[in-house]
Amino acid sequence: LTCVTSKSIFGITTENCPDGQNLCFKKWYYLNHRYSDITWGCAATCPKPTNVRETIHCCETDKCNE
């Protein structure tokens, strides 16, 4: 599985997930009418939001967390 780990004006950076990590995730924190502090990566299980302003999307196909 290949997941996006960062995005910039120059494109995306990806990584091949290690064995046992079969999910891609994108986590972002909502603040002041815009999304900030976005995190991408691989996971074995879908992370849980730590507060009401945090949103997490998990998926199972290559680069699905773009």
Curated annotation (Swiss-Prot):
Any single GO CC term annotated in Swiss-Prot or TrEMBL for this entry: extracellular region
One Pfam family matching this protein: Toxin_cobra-type
Disulfide bonds, paired cysteine numbers: C3-C24, C17-C42, C46-C58, C59-C64
GO-annotated molecular function: toxin activity
Xref: Gene3D superfamilies: CD59 (2.10.60.10)
Keyword Disulfide bond among UniProt keywords: yes
Localisation per UniProt entry: Secreted
InterPro entries, per database record: Snake_3FTx (IPR003571), Snake_toxin-like_sf (IPR045860), Snake_toxin_con_site (IPR018354), Toxin_cobra-type (IPR054131)
Expressed in which tissues: Expressed by the venom gland.
Keywords: Disulfide bond, G-protein coupled receptor impairing toxin, Neurotoxin, Postsynaptic neurotoxin, Secreted, Toxin
UniProt main location, coarse: secreted
Record's function text: Selectively binds with high-affinity to the a2B-adrenoceptor subtype (ADRA2B). The toxin reversibly binds to ADRA2B, and its mode of inhibition is non-competitive. The toxin has also been described to bind with high affinity to all muscarinic receptor subtypes (Ki=23 nM (on CHRM1), Ki=44 nM (on CHRM2), Ki=3 nM (on CHRM3), Ki=5 nM (on CHRM4), and Ki=8 nM (on CHRM5)) but no other data support these affinity values.
Other facts: Negative results: does not affect most adrenoceptors (ADRA1A, ADRA1B, ADRA2A and ADRA2C) and muscarinic receptors. Does not affect beta-1 (ADRB1) and beta-2 (ADRB2) adrenoceptors.
Similarity comment: Belongs to the three-finger toxin family. Short-chain subfamily. Aminergic toxin sub-subfamily.
Protein name, per record: Muscarinic toxin alpha
Species of the source: Dendroaspis polylepis polylepis (Black mamba)
